[in-house]
Regions:
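C-terminal helix-rich "cap/oligomerization" subdomain common to oxidoreductases
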Residues: 1-7, 73-75, 298-333
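Conserved SAM-binding strand-loop segment of SAM-dependent methyltransferases
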Residues: 55-62
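Beta-strand-loop-alpha-helix segment that lines the small-molecule cofactor/substrate pocket
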Residues: 73, 79-80, 84-131, 146
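Predominantly a Rossmann-like dinucleotide-binding segment in NAD(P)-dependent oxidoreductases
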Residues: 130-209, 227, 333
Length: 333
């Protein structure tokens, strides 16, 4: 990408729902990027989405999109088991890659992808959009600034209901399951807030008897003398919440991951001294933003400035290592 005001030209691999409904519109609203192409193995589907979203080019193969010389970067929302293959192929084509989470199926595969992209000289980032939302930047600022004292615990719940056997999230060989799809979020949050990797991981999981994917996974990560705990499920009432607890206060993040784009978000900060006899709770409100747009602009700026992405590949590798550890601790294959 020419280090100028020229927008980053994006190509999108597949007509996946997350791209159609969320990420593509967000990039189209961004300051530093534009979507110029979309590809699908179903050419009619690619053209239909392109027409619907106003995308100039539609390709009937991923290879054709990667061969186009007017594309700077690729957004990869393919099923998890295809992340590694097509991220590498995009790198070989000289395209920067924003890859949906989790980056790969395991740490070993992630290490190979990262090395491949480094050798190709392209910018690679795992798409954890929540990290760009002001509510999380503020939460991190409060924790690092000592507003709640010493960080002692992070607790998270994230769930939705999906029992469609044909859905990729319920297919084991595609990298489906609650841990891979949404467990990666609380793991990422805990590592980021503690600024460290866990010393120990314990976990339990319940698996669907037919598909074999985990449908309820709970884990505890030890960070020195502090703990992070989470439960994720794909077969319970949709809900998400994160509690960040310190020695002299706590923070509750109301909608931590799927922050809405149609209303403000809030965090609840309770800090009443040590010990807090009757602490007051302050509600901090954040203006309406699209965290996917913020992510796209940050990625484009990193490429323009010739620097590593805001979430470097090393972070994706470390997160994948913890996912592996949770799987192992829960007794999964």
């Amino acid at each position: 990408m020419n280090p100028s005001a020229t927008p980053l030209r994006w190509g999108v691999l597949s007509t996946a729902k997350i791209g159609r409904t969320t990420v593509i519109p967000a990039i189209q609203r961004s300051e530093h990027g534009t979507v110029v192409a979309i590809a699908s193995r179903d050419g009619e589907a690619a053209h239909a989405v392109a027409d619907d979203l106003g995308i100039p080019q539609a390709f009937s193969s991923y290879e054709a999109l990667l061969a186009a010389d007017d594309i700077d970067a690729v957004y990869n929302p393919l099923p998890n088991h295809l992340h590694a293959e097509w991220t590498k192929k995009a790198a070989d084509a000289g395209k920067h890659v924003l890859c949906e989470k989790p980056l790969t199926l395991d740490r070993t595969e992630a290490a190979g992808v990262i090395a491949h992209c480094e050798a190709a000289g392209i910018v690679l980032q795992e798409a954890f959009m929540y990290r760009f939302h002001p509510q999380w930047l503020r939460t991190k600022q409060l924790v690092d600034g000592g507003r709640i004292g010493e960080l002692r615990a992070v607790q998270a719940w994230f769930s939705y209901f999906n029992d469609d056997a044909a859905n990729i999230r319920n297919v084991a060989e595609y990298g489906g399951g609650a841990l891979m799809d949404i467990g990666c979020y609380p793991i990422s949050v805990a590592r980021w807030l503690f600024g460290a990797e866990p010393d120990d991981v314990q976990a339990i999981a319940h698996h669907d008897p037919v598909s074999g994917v985990d449908i309820l996974t709970s884990a505890m990560m030890r960070f020195g003398t502090a703990h992070a705990t989470f439960s994720v499920s794909t077969r319970t009432e949709p809900y998400q919440r994160v509690h960040v607890i310190g020695t002299t206060g706590r923070i509750e993040v109301e909608i931590p991951f799927n922050a809405p784009t149609d209303r403000p978000t809030h965090i609840f900060v309770t800090a009443g001294g040590s010990p807090p006899a009757d602490p007051a709770t302050e509600i901090e409100e954040f203006a309406i933003v699209d965290q996917y747009t913020l992510q796209a602009d940050a990625f484009a700026m990193a490429i323009r400035d010739g620097r590593t992405a805001a979430l470097p590949p090393s972070d994706a590798l470390a997160n994948m290592a913890v996912i592996d550890a949770v799987r192992t601790a829960a007794g999964a294959a």
